[in-house]
Curated annotation (Swiss-Prot):
GO biological process: 1,6-anhydro-N-acetyl-beta-muramic acid catabolic process; amino sugar metabolic process; peptidoglycan turnover
The gene coding this protein: anmK
Name of the protein: Anhydro-N-acetylmuramic acid kinase
Pathway: Amino-sugar metabolism; 1,6-anhydro-N-acetylmuramate degradation; Cell wall biogenesis; peptidoglycan recycling
Reaction(s) catalysed by this chain's protein: 1,6-anhydro-N-acetyl-beta-muramate + ATP + H2O = N-acetyl-D-muramate 6-phosphate + ADP + H(+)
Matches recorded under InterPro entries: Anhydro_N_Ac-Mur_kinase, ATPase_NBD
Native organism: Shewanella piezotolerans (strain WP3 / JCM 13877)
SS bond list: none
UniProt KW Aminoacyl-tRNA synthetase keyword: no
Gene3D superfamilies on file: 3.30.420.40
Transferase as UniProt keyword: yes
Length: 369
């Protein structure tokens, strides 16, 4: 059977599910053939959230969750292929990002750790797996993130326009495509949905604030917003990346000590503005006008999109759907693309973005045989 497909697997810092995509490439141009989102079971989600918090972790828990996430990713692949009516023998490789449980690239011995055992995925799908995409970049002195700007450049760049590709998952990141000979720039701007989701889960017993409806009922506290924006991360120069190790519920509770007079809704509104202002500040530092295309879960938050448009009046702001890719599936397709790059022996990182000392082929192969 002729092998012609790649599969991309992604679970981001929001931990809102495993996205699986079936992709066919013509050169670097992807065609999305099928997609599937696999829910993370509640017990597994709770254990993953515990593992992501700074502290002393049990090796047993890590090992168990590594296998459990691998099995969940494999289930997502098998369901995807069933839905698409595609035989596993037609798939060249799976590109699996895994689930990040630590991302600490700025230590003296920086590291990043994604779990979701690729051996388990290969064994339970019968398909070769390309995984462990971030650690080569860190070994070369880089941040290991963000990796998606290389994909954004290949798929979304145009010489006619300055474009920002904004991904809002748990953490938000931007890719600046200048449309000329300037180097592509990309970095994490700070919290995306992670703080808003944590606050909503704690006070509303809901997984997230749908459409930003709860935030819309509150009033942003300017003093609290300025306090949050004074965090040193926001003034760091690129390359930079961050994660739940820094911006999490425990950190938020520490910041709220002098703001306990605010209502829960006012705090939610302020957290939404923290995301929007940090994105807008970094965007304006790159260019005062242009086009912005949003992907990730934040693209569906109507209040967030509305506030971004108010902060960036000289930007045309819409979602990546206008460029032909549904915002939910952009990152999954990016990891199918990275698997394709590995298969062809081509580099997958942009040193100007990550800070690595050279471009490199990312990932390792885990054979199904």
């Amino acid at each position: 059977m002729n092998k012609s497909y790649f599969i991309g697997l992604m679970s981001g810092t929001s931990m809102d599910g495993v996205d699986a995509v079936l992709v066919k490439f013509s050169g670097d141009t992807p065609s999305l053939i099928a997609h599937h989102s696999e829910e993370i079971p509640a017990a597994l989600l709770r254990n993953l959230q515990k593992l992501c918090l700074p502290g002393n972790d049990e090796i047993n828990r890590l090992g168990h969750l590594d296998r459990a996430v691998g099995k969940l990713f494999a289930k997502a692949v098998n369901t995807l292929l069933d839905k698409a009516g595609v035989d596993k023998l037609a798939v060249i490789a799976i590109g699996s990002h895994g689930q990040t449980v630590r991302h600490m690239p700025n230590l003296e011995m920086g590291f990043t750790l994604q779990i979701g055992d690729p051996n388990t995925i290969a064994a339970e799908t019968g398909i070769d797996v390309i995984a462990d995409f971030r650690r080569k970049d860190i070994a070369l002195g880089g941040q290991g993130a963000p990796l998606v700007p290389a994909f954004h450049q290949q798929v979304f760049a145009t010489p006619e326009h300055k474009r920002i590709i904004l991904n809002i998952g748990g953490i938000a990141n931007i890719t600046y495509l200048p449309g000329n000979t300037e180097a592509v720039t990309g970095f994490d701007t700070g919290p995306g949905n992670t703080l808003m989701d944590a606050w909503t889960q704690y006070h509303q017993d809901l997984p997230y604030d749908k459409d930003g409806a709860w935030a819309k009922t509150g009033t942003t506290d300017d003093k609290m917003l300025l306090h949050l924006l004074s965090h040193p991360y926001f003034s760091l120069a690129a390359p930079k990346s961050t994660g739940r190790e820094l911006f999490n519920q425990a950190w938020l509770e520490q910041q709220l000590a002098e703001f306990n007079h605010l209502s829960d809704a006012d705090i939610q509104s302020t957290l939404l503005d923290l995301t929007c202002f940090s994105i807008a500040n970094d965007t304006l530092a790159l260019s005062t006008m242009g086009e912005m295309y949003v992907c990730g879960g934040g693209a569906y938050n109507t209040e967030l999109m509305c506030r971004l448009k108010q902060l960036l009046p000289h930007y045309k702001i819409t979602t990546t759907a206008e460029l032909g890719i549904n915002p939910q599936w952009v990152e999954g397709i990016a990891f199918a693309w990275l698997a394709m790059r590995f298969h062809l022996g081509l580099p997958g990182n942009l040193p100007a973005v990550t800070g690595a000392n050279r471009a490199a082929i990312l990932g390792g192969k885990f054979s199904a045989l």
